[in-house]
């Protein structure tokens, strides 16, 4: 089907090139229309008219004669034939002739007829069109599908060269045929064309040859291969199959036997080992050998294990990396949570500080308005004639007098001292303390903070025992000193014992 479509396209392009090279003149169109009008009026004169048209050609290119005509009807004509020959061929084929009507210039609409003479429309498969068979001029008709079914050639049977007849092959295209013609070839012809093409012989015929790839060898195809339907657009599927790759790691596959005969003397092959499909790893790398055996050179099972192990290790690496990333993210999240907690604590501390500042400000406001009264400093209750005056110490805390609280220990009140100072022209805050508030002089024969003076009282003996216990003397000596202290009777002996004890300790 693909070769036939290519043929139609090629011939159509040739017609277009011919029309562009030699445009059809108006005189030729009028003569053709007049001839077709005469044919429609006198069908019996078709053959004579056709011969006259062949004798007096108007200069049109033969491939384009059949492309111009009525757009409504008419049987298809063979390239190079006239109108009369078309009707004669129709009578030979058993197809009733149709009257041709003259109309405006345009492309001819072709019709296909079956054996009963009825027009067949809507046919998409060109293999089912009734066409002229062969290249030898035989006028017998054959259908594309019927021909392929009735052919003596067994489809899929390999020839002597090892190729099966699975397609139509390459057929030369004649330059003199019309674009609407469809060529068919017998199975034997296709077989011969494929054989010649495989051997590289040149075709003596004119035209171009479509190259067809050699069909696959059915012997090498896998038994479980599924057939592949190619783009033949026909009812029969091609016998192409999916062939599983026979390449396996570990060994070089054996070569296919060549059908050609050797041109020279052959080499002895007695020592050649038999071909194998797989080879196991038999040598490890050693520094002496200098060769490295890759794990990929093992058999298929070991190679599969190697790839599986490599893939597994890659997956494990990815999992480890993801786990590490997840762990780092968890650490970052924990640190962020701790920062959020610290932020909350800082906010609470700020609030507490603000509250304390408010409390301190409130206390300062209250203290600034408090007046502290000191007893005994006002009007003397025993002297009703005394002048009433405000106590100078009744002031805020911040503005207190430096002589405050001294009136209780001085001989004279502050008021009388101030009046006396004013009369003398100066003020003085100094005064004499009352006798009961004055300190007595320190006695040298009595114990005080200045020194210890032992006496006959129990307190003196307790102080001496404490001095002996807190010293760094040995325990035996401490016990001996305690015994001597208990035997001393009198103040003078006790004072001498104290002096001796202090000398022993200070050594």
From Swiss-Prot:
Record note on domains: The N-terminus consists of a long intrinsically disordered tail. The central part contains the coiled-coil multimerization domain (MD). Forms a four-stranded coiled coil structure. The C-terminus constitutes the alpha-helical domain (XD) that binds to the nucleocapsid (N-RNA complex).
Acidic residues compositional bias, start-end: 146-160
Biased composition (Low complexity): 134-145, 260-270
Segments forming a coiled coil: none
Name of this protein: Phosphoprotein
GO biological process: DNA-templated transcription; viral genome replication
Keyword Phosphoprotein: yes
Complexes and interactors: Homotetramer. Interacts (via multimerization domain and XD domain) with polymerase L; this interaction forms the polymerase L-P complex. Interacts (via N-terminus) with N0 (via Ncore); this interaction allows P to chaperon N0 to avoid N polymerization and non-specific RNA binding before encapsidation. Interacts (via C-terminus) with N-RNA template (via Ntail); this interaction maintains the P/L complex anchored to the nucleocapsid template during the sequential transcription. Interacts (via C-terminus) with protein C this interaction allows C to associate with the ribonucleocapsid.
Posttranslational modification: Phosphorylation on serines by host CK2 is necessary for the formation of viral factories.
Region of interest called Multimerization, as start-end residue ranges on this chain: 304-376
Gene3D superfamilies with a match to the protein in the record: 1.20.5.110, DNA helicase RuvA subunit, C-terminal domain (1.10.8.10)
UniProt xrefs under Pfam families: Paramyx_P_V_C (PF03210), Paramyxo_P_V_N (PF13825)
């Amino acid at each position: 089907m693909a070769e036939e479509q290519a043929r139609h396209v090629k011939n159509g392009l040739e017609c277009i090139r011919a029309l562009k090279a030699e445009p059809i003149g108006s005189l030729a169109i009028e003569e053709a229309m007049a001839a077709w009008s005469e044919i429609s009026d006198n069908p019996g004169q078709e053959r004579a008219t056709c011969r006259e048209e062949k004798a007096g050609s108007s200069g049109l290119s033969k491939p384009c004669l059949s492309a111009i005509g009525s757009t409504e009807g008419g049987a298809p004509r063979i390239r190079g034939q006239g109108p009369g020959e078309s009707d004669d061929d129709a009578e030979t084929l058993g197809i009733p002739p149709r009257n041709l009507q003259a109309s405006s210039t345009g492309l001819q609409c072709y019709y296909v007829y079956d054996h009963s003479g009825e027009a067949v429309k809507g046919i998409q498969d060109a293999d089912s069109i009734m066409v002229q068979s062969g290249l030898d001029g035989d006028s017998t008709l054959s259908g594309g599908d019927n021909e392929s079914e009735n052919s003596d050639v067994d489809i899929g049977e390999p020839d002597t060269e090892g190729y099966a007849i699975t397609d139509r092959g390459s057929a030369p295209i004649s330059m003199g045929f019309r674009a609407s013609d469809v060529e068919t070839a017998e199975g034997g012809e296709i077989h011969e064309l494929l054989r010649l093409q495989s051997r590289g012989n040149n075709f003596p015929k004119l035209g171009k040859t479509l190259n067809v790839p050699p069909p696959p060898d059915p012997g090498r195809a896998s038994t479980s291969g599924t057939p592949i339907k190619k783009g033949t657009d026909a009812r029969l599927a091609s016998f192409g199959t999916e062939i599983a790759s026979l390449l396996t790691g570990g060994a070089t596959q054996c070569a296919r036997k060549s059908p050609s005969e050797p041109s020279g003397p052959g080499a002895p092959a007695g020592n050649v080992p038999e071909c194998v499909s797989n080879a196991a790893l038999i040598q490890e790398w050693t520094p002496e050998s200098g060769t490295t055996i890759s794990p990929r050179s093992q058999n298929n099972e070991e190679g599969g294990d190697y790839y599986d192990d490599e893939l597994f290790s890659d997956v494990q690496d990815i999992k480890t990396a993801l786990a590490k990333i997840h762990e780092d993210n968890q650490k970052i999240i924990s640190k962020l949570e701790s920062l959020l907690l610290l932020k909350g604590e800082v906010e609470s501390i700020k609030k507490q500080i603000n509250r304390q500042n408010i409390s301190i400000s409130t206390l300062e406001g209250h203290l600034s308005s408090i007046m502290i009264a000191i007893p005994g400093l006002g009007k003397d209750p025993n002297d009703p004639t005394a002048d009433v005056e405000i106590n100078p110490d009744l002031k805020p805390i911040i503005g207190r007098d430096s002589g405050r609280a001294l009136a209780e220990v001085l001989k004279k009140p502050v008021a009388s001292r101030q009046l006396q100072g004013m009369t003398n022209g100066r003020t003085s805050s100094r005064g004499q303390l009352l006798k009961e508030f004055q300190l007595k002089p320190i006695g040298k024969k009595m114990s005080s903070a200045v020194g210890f003076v032992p006496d006959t009282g129990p307190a003196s003996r307790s102080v001496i025992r404490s001095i002996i216990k807190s010293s760094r003397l040995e325990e035996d000596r401490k016990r001996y000193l305690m015994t001597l202290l208990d035997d001393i009777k009198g103040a003078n002996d006790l004072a001498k014992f104290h002096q001796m004890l202090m000398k022993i300790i200070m050594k």
